[in-house]
């Protein structure tokens, strides 16, 4: 993807900020918010026109009626304007309205058939296309959606990290799983990746710290939900902030752009490589012990899974990790994955299938 073009060619390089309401609810609401976003120094305005809601009966957007409002915001305040699309029909209407770009939502990204239809409908266009991550933390699904657009000739492309659905209890609406966008960047280093702290956090008080964390991790910008009267919003009211709060948030962000010298960076990376190698060696050693335990259990007709033992191990690891300043959630994920592989190895021993 070395031939990608800037998302918006007339904007200065640096972090890209996009802001606007979850939904375009009325002309007055949209223009009031657009003015506030403009005054906050943001040059790209977003608003949902068609809203794919989880349950029927929720506000599903104003539809094509709202497209002229977005066009008016563009012309009145000199903003680039974008909205979400999910079908070729949406794309046709957006192009007729003269909008500057679109984003593709998480539910649509999840569906390869829908993505191919959208990619075909966008063939030959030169508007900005932003692709949100799929609902599940599947980097192949995300990169595949982007590749479909790229293969259709789209060159103004970016990804948007909005977090992932989870059955686990977390302080966030959508678990960030930062490793997924980091892996996407490793695979597609030329692709800009923005973060959407509004959808990750789900509550307005979490937007600023999540925005700062994203920039600390090297994200190329932010997409933030902003509403002139957020408490009266017809959708996602809790996660939207006022234009004034948006300006304060952007002013508070620290851009860590000072480059580390290449020699120092190389040394850090070599150290990381060495540690990773040791981790793999230790994991291989641990799996060897797990297989020996599997042999013992088979010889004594014992069940492979000993739930009490794993719970004890997990609690001890989480307690130790907390003292070391490591996230309990992270340790839980790591040890669960290790336990799963250990069980797989022991089951293979039971079946004489270990290789």
Predicted region positions:
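Extended, charge-rich alpha-helical interface modules
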Residues: 253-355
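Catalytic alpha/beta core domains of metabolic enzymes, predominantly
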Residues: 10, 114-248, 252, 257-261
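Catalytic beta/alpha-barrel core
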Residues: 60-62, 78-91, 100-114, 127-139, ...
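Glycine-rich, proline-tolerant flexible connector loops at the mouths of alpha/beta enzymes
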Residues: 46-65, 228-237, 293-302
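Long, contiguous binding/interaction regions
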Residues: 25, 34, 38, 43, ...
């Amino acid at each position: 993807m070395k031939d990608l073009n800037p998302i918006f060619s007339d904007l200065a390089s640096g972090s890209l900020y996009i802001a606007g309401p979850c939904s375009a609810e009325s002309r007055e609401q949209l223009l009031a918010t657009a003015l506030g976003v403009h005054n906050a120094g943001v040059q790209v305005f977003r608003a949902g026109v068609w809203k794919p809601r989880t349950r029927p009966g929720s506000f599903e957007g104003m539809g094509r009626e709202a497209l002229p409002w977005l066009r008016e915001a563009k012309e009145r305040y000199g903003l680039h304007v974008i909205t979400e699309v999910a079908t070729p029909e949406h794309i046709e209407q957006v192009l007729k309205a003269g909008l500057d770009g679109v984003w593709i939502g998480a539910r649509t990204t999840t569906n390869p058939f829908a993505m191919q239809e959208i990619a075909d409908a966008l063939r030959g266009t030169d508007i900005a296309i932003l692709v949100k991550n799929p609902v599940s933390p599947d980097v192949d699904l995300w990169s595949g959606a982007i590749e479909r657009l790229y293969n259709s000739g789209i060159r103004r492309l970016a990804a948007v990290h909005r977090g992932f659905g989870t059955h686990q209890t977390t302080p966030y609406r959508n678990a960030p799983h930062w490793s997924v966008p980091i892996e996407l960047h490793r695979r597609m280093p030329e692709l800009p990746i923005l973060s959407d702290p509004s959808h990750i956090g789900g509550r307005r008080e979490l937007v600023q710290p999540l925005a700062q964390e994203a920039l600390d991790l090297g994200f190329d910008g932010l997409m933030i939900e902003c509403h002139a009267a957020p408490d009266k919003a017809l959708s996602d009211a809790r996660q939207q902030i006022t234009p004034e709060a948006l300006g304060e948030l952007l002013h508070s962000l620290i851009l860590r752009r000072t480059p580390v010298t290449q020699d120092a960076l190389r040394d850090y990376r070599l150290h990381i490589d060495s540690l990773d190698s040791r981790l793999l060696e230790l994991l291989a050693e641990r799996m060897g012990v797990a297989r020996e335990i599997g042999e013992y259990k088979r010889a004594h007709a014992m069940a492979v899974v000993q739930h009490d033992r794993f719970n004890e191990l997990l609690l001890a690891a989480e307690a130790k990790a907390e003292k070391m300043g490591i996230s309990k959630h992270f340790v839980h994920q790591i040890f669960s994955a290790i336990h799963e592989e250990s069980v797989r190895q022991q089951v293979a021993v039971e079946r004489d299938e270990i290789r």
